[in-house]
Amino acid sequence: MVYETSYESGRKPFKPDLHRGKWEKPTDYIYACFGLALKLDSFVVSYWFFFDMGLFGILPYYIYMALYLVPILVIHSFMGQFSSSGFISAFRVSPFFKGMGYVSLALSLATLLYYSLFAFVPLIFIMHSLRPTLPWSCEGISSWSNESTICNMTNTQVHTLLDSRNKWETFEMTIVRAPSVIFFKKYYEVTSQPVDESYILSWHIVGFSFAIWALITFIFYNFSETAKFGKLVRYMVVSTLVLLVVCFIRFLFLPGAWDGLTHFVKPRADSMVNGTRAMLIIVLQAFGSGWGTVIALSSFNNFKTNVMKYNWIIAFGQTLVYILFGMVTYMLDNYFKTIEPKDFSSYVLKNWVSYLSGASALSTLEWPNMWTIIYFTMMLMASLIVMITQLFTVFTSLFDEFEVLRMYKKKVIYGVLGLLSVFSVLLCSNHGVRHLTALSADSLISHSVMHLLLLLAVLWVYGRERFQRDIEFMLGQPFASWKVFILRFIAPLFLLNSLLISIIVSSFEHLLFSMAIYISLFVLLPVLCIPGYGVYIMCKNTGGFCNRFRRACRPNDWYPVEMEDRQKYEEVVGNADITHQLYEVTEEVN
């Protein structure tokens, strides 16, 4: 394969952003990737479809981690670190596939809309925890609600209710709600009765949503520089994990907590079976909601950073986060099981146990206001870490790809945040929540397809030998051929399996809606944009079809940004593979 510069291909030359900066500490890359494990919608999806897995359900994760998570992390980090550019410009390695970068941009922005839900829900509980009496506690709910909850449903009352409701029925079941679920539900209620009230906005939620985006804007106003941002994320991740451990220790004293932990660590064959499916989904969460997040984060590494070692640390660290969150969720879930009566058919409805129902369990602790604030502050920080990290990679990729935007960085950042805050209002209705949260499941399909295309672009189109040579040059150490074999032949098999599981999960999300419309909007259209952009690149080339296709697939301005590394790379590659001296492309920089 022949290398080309932009001048020879007729395209605008790539000019690196010399002011993009580097991490203050090399480990900031690790902390930022740890933050991706706090993507809490993955816990919601896996718990809903594959609940009751326990610790042994996570064991298949280690197999997947070795066979395709870490290898694909290496591909992502190689593209970002070698090119020192975001997830759009990094596809100079094969411009035909550059549409993947734009699809990643669209996925990042779209998923940020629904992910704000995971931020403003904790904020609601934090603000109301400042009251002297928690409104969802057994004492507080009696002042504003007469509904039957776990607080006022005695055995006698339940038997009476069963007799009155099931007089002519043979099946007897009573559904009892947690007070915190009823409390949150009232924020979506409206006083009028329109034809379809699910489309009516909850103005309480709108206010909290704008508060979240205002907080994010404040963060980027003060921490938009790479070194400052990395330091902020480092402290936020450490603080979040410390609060998570504190909550874990305190929850050990909840009724039924030890039973829940025992059930969590108990070996069960069905856990392994469920884990083989669920972990295929969880593994994909390591790359963030927008797929290209790791590419952009690794672009701030020094050129010789040993990402092989870092990626193993990231994979094991993310697993630890999953286990901690899993144990906390099990303890909260088992608390409600202990208060369910044993002598009749009744069930405590645990909506979104980590968020909504969990607040009722916290209200039973000593100093409930303090523990509620601590727990939901941890959840809020986890959501903010995911959101600001993803936004940071979006802005970085935009500025790397579009040179004209670099002059207006602040305006672009505030403009994008303003638009996202406006469109996130769609989440402030029942209709919006039901439809936009389906993006989480739909994005799993897109991620699996794009991982497969990435392997095709780097290991088959760019070539196995060239990839192996480049990563050895970057790391300064050998990269074994068996690792390349796993990437080319083993990892795609697991990705195809994860694609199948993702399609099944997505179909469940769309059972009540028009599946054809949503699949076309969030899955098919983004995937079709990738070859569409490739055709666009071919049209800009000259010659016959085959010649146009070959030139569209050739690496274009693919070299290290730093002059010293670039000249060494030219010597390694040799003039036989390069049609133009690499350093001439950015001669004006020096």
Where are these regions (language model features)?
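Membrane-embedded translocation segments of transport machinery
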Residues: 2-25, 30, 226-390, 396-425, ...
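Flexible loop linkers connecting adjacent transmembrane helices
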Residues: 5-13, 45-59, 74-102, 122-142, ...
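Juxtamembrane transmembrane-helix boundary signature
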Residues: 31-34, 38, 60-95, 111, ...
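Hydrophobic alpha-helical segments and their helix-loop junctions in multi-pass secondary transporters
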Residues: 72, 115-133, 241-263, 331-333, ...
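Extracellular/lumenal N-termini and interhelical loops of multi-pass eukaryotic membrane proteins
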Residues: 116-197, 257-260, 265-269, 339-363, ...
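C-terminal membrane-solvent junction of multi-pass transporters and transport-like membrane proteins
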Residues: 402-417, 442-503, 508-520
